[in-house]
């Protein structure tokens, strides 16, 4: 089978929404080429430093690549992708160059080439994310391993917004907590909360592709007894009192349910938000405070921030 590689030159801010657009269009895998990765020291499973090739990365911005099967619907699909990406401008998302190129690759190239980008990555004091095809031996007895398959929707979970959220969950979630994950995507945050011994985790996403992906990942990581994934629009119709609510989605979306999150939390409960580009930090912070929250910590990585707020 022949595959079409769609390459989009964009900004850090636009990486996550564009990746989601590509997955919803049927992309079988997404590769993110970020020059900031060249500055990170990485280790392989044997503790050896491995090097990334600078020729694989742009001088500025980020390149997002996706793969679609070549068929009679490809042209229509690509046009739809372009239109949906351009619509992100309505949400004040900087698209940068926003150049889109298309090339053809064969089955073997597509099936193996993207694996060079993915290795086990330790993202917090406790958590390491491991691609499903890698054999990994924990370095510490209390290390928590999350297995992810980037061939499934929503990538491997090493994007800064996800990393910040997991670091925040590690600090906040206590044994026996009741947790809500809004806009779960891959389900990785729900998996992390379950591994931190939450009593229950309810994960919600409006996108049926995300719901299916999250359910598969929850099962893969053997936390189905704790984490439940359902299709739902943000917090609509949700009741009860909870200890932690986590949301890794666009700042503009977070602003729509800050008050609702406040009402669903117990006194002393925490609202962890991420997916916030630096320039939107103050706007989200003010909205949280207006809803009644106290900001207790702001974490940052590259151009992104995560805000931990307390009721």
Curated annotation (Swiss-Prot):
Transmembrane recorded as keyword: no
Gene3D superfamilies tied to this protein: Vaccinia Virus protein VP39
Top-tier EC class: transferase
Pfam families: PrmA (PF06325)
Nuclease in keyword set: no
GO cellular component, one term: cytoplasm
Subcellular location: Cytoplasm
Biological role: Methylates ribosomal protein L11.
Name of the molecule in the record: Ribosomal protein L11 methyltransferase
Gene that encodes it: prmA
